[in-house]
Each structure stands twice: as structure tokens, then as C-alpha cells.
Amino acid sequence: DKDAIQIVPLMIKYAAELKNKGRMLKDELEDITRNVGNFNDKLFSHTFEGTQGKAKIENIMTQFRSETPSEMCGLKVIAIEDFETGKKTDLQNDEVSDITLPKANVIKIYFNEGFIALRPSGTEPKIKLYVSLSCDHFDVVAQKMNDAIFNS
């Protein structure tokens, strides 16, 4: 992604700090993986041209907001962040709290295994699904989530 370059100077600085402590970045990453798990990420981008395409994107977002499932592909939904309303709903504790980030047309669904986020592009006739999960058969699960949202 075009924004990924921003992390490079920070990673260089962090690697230098670790080296001063006698560690390598590889060691640190292995510790993180051991403690947190290995997450995989995938981006699905769908283009819908013209007025009908814009309406389809809006309908997908509206439907996803109003009919958020309690589980997806066997993964239990534990929380939902709707950046348009500025609210986070914790389904485990049945609590609603405010999101401190700016309002945006983004929905983020959390599972114990990670999250997915859905948002329309601000500059193109596209809608994007971000999948970040730590689970077996990641590619299959990610594709099934994509299909469930866009082929319904």
C-alpha cells in the first residue's frame, strides 16, 4: 500500500535501538509472534462504476450496518465499531462506548481471531474489505468472508 513507506524510518530507528541492546529485529518479531500469534492480512477491492455502482456501494454499507451477523465463517463477532455513528458495541458485555477517532464511513467487526473492516473509497468507485485474522486456512476464510459480503 502507498502508506506503508511511512513505517520504514521508524523500523530503521527501532532496529538500531534493538541492536544497541544486543537484539535483532528478527528476534523481536519472533517474540511478538510467539506472544500474540501470526496474523495474516488481505485486501479485497471491488469496483462499481457509475450511478448504479455508487448506489450498490451505499446499499452494501447500509445492509452491513443494519444486518451485522453474530458470526461470520464460523468466527464469533465480539464487537462492532461504526465510525459513522462514532459508536463501538461490545457484544460480549452488551456495552456501547464512544469511538475517539473522527467519523468516517467505516465499519470494523472484531472476532477473537482478529477483525475485518469495510469502507468505500473516497476517491474511486470502489469498496474495500480489509481482513486481518490469526486462524487456520486464512485464505479460505478471507475469501468466504469476501463472498458473504459481496455475493449476497
Enumerate the predicted regions with their spans.
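Phosphate-binding and adjacent anionic-ligand microenvironments
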Residues: D1-R119, K126-Y130, H137-A142, I149-S152
